[in-house]
A protein has these predicted regions:
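Active-site-adjacent structural elements that line small-molecule/cofactor binding pockets in enzymes
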Residues: 1-227
């Protein structure tokens, strides 16, 4: 088991000191999330000021971006961090996608599954494993010229985690992602009775085993000077 934490920042310039402090304290990983600041830029700063802390987004909003954009971000963050990056994606909720990001909300679980598969298809092209020919219901990526191909990543590919709460989005993580990020509003009962069966359903759909999926369980913690 690893112990991670999120690092909410009021000022993005704090990333250089806060993530270094997390590493010094002994955390295994420090994660950003999409709130007041861009979750990727703060981690790029953190990567330059840490040595072994695992870094990731938990979560970056997938539906506010497209698979090619996310593929570039994940690939570059893996290089900048020296192989320590986790691309953590989530859907947000319909009002935020439509009214805050002016995006499209439809078939969220199916769309999330397709985003992950599209990113992996793009990475496979860059790694020289297959030509780019991804044609899905929501996204199409069928052209890649040498000028836009960064080539194989010297640190390998970053894992893709997706967040979920309901059964369909949770099953989507089991089907396509490398890891699942449980919503902070969870309990032991909800994980055992709802999340794990949904993950297993998704794993079975893609012919994978439970050992193929990492689970990151978020927990809300309140501390004070006296406790």
């Amino acid at each position: 088991m690893n112990v991670y934490t999120t690092a909410p920042l009021e000022d993005p310039r704090e990333a250089r000191t806060i993530y270094r402090e997390l590493e010094d304290i002994g955390y295994d990983g420090g994660f950003s999330f999409e709130a007041k600041h861009d979750p990727f830029l703060t981690l790029a700063v953190a990567a330059e000021h840490t040595r072994h802390l695992r870094l990731g987004t938990a979560i970056a909003i997938a539906f506010a971006r497209n698979p090619m954009n996310l593929a570039n971000l994940g690939y570059d963050m893996q290089s900048i961090s020296g192989g320590r990056f986790v691309l953590g994606l989530g859907s947000q909720v319909k009002p935020h996608i439509e009214k805050r990001f002016s995006g499209v909300w439809s078939h969220p679980a199916e769309r999330m599954t397709e985003i992950v598969k599209a990113i992996k298809a793009i990475w496979a092209c860059w790694e020289g494993k297959a030509p780019l020919k991804f044609e899905g219901r929501f996204y199409r990526h069928t052209i890649m010229i040498p000028a836009f191909n960064p080539g194989p990543n010297p640190y390998g590919l970053p894992p893709i985690f997706t967040g979920g709460f309901g059964p369909l989005m949770t099953a989507a993580a089991g089907e396509a992602a490398d890891g699942f990020i449980a919503h902070p509003f969870n309990s032991r009962r909800s994980l055992l009775e709802n999340a794990l069966p949904a993950l297993q359903k998704g794993l079975a759909k893609s012919g994978r085993r439970r050992s193929d999926l990492e689970i990151m369980c978020a927990t809300l913690v309140v501390t004070a000077n006296t406790e």
